[in-house]
Amino acid sequence: MSDAKLTAEELERLLSAEFPRMFDREKGVSILKVWHRGCLVRQGFHPRALRPGGTISGVAMMGLTDLAMYIAVLASIGWVPLAVTTNLNINFLNKPPPRALEAECRLIKLGKRLAVGEIAIRSEGERELVAHATSTYAMPLRSAT
């Protein structure tokens, strides 16, 4: 199930160095697993992610979704930090309780210029989805060296 171009440890090191405000283990983000065309990412619980009503905010879930997609793309094509989100569509299905979230991303298309992924978000330890998303990433042209 692996064949990833970068390991979880390599990705955590690179993301921490290049995007220290976005990716920070102190904020509870960790890459649990990567494989070619996918990953599993955990976002620890923090009270600032709550919205009125005591549930995790949509903003927090969208950020986790985008991060999982980025990690799946990088794990599959290697370190190409200029890959960018071109579309993200999310459906909020259930209210997540105030605890950690896990996002599993599976790339359903991986081309030379575009990657399309499906992301399932669950509360840690639960089977039922709290959100489901699809996303598209554009990759810069790579030189033919």
Per-range role (PLM):
Residues 50, 80-82, 113-115:
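A conserved beta-turn-beta hairpin within the catalytic core of GNAT-like acetyltransferases
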Residues 71-102, 107:
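Hydrophobic beta-strand-centered segment that forms part of the acyl-chain substrate-binding groove
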Residues 27, 37-39, 58, 82-88, ...:
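A generic structural signal for short beta-strands and their flanking turns/coil linkers
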Residues 44-68:
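Hot-dog-fold acyl-thioester-processing enzymes
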Residues 1-42, 47:
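Non-catalytic linker/capping segments at the edges of enzyme domains
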Residues 2-6, 96-98, 102, 108-145:
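HotDog/MaoC-like acyl-thioester-processing domains
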Residues 43-45, 92, 139:
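Hydrophobic residues in beta-strands and at strand termini
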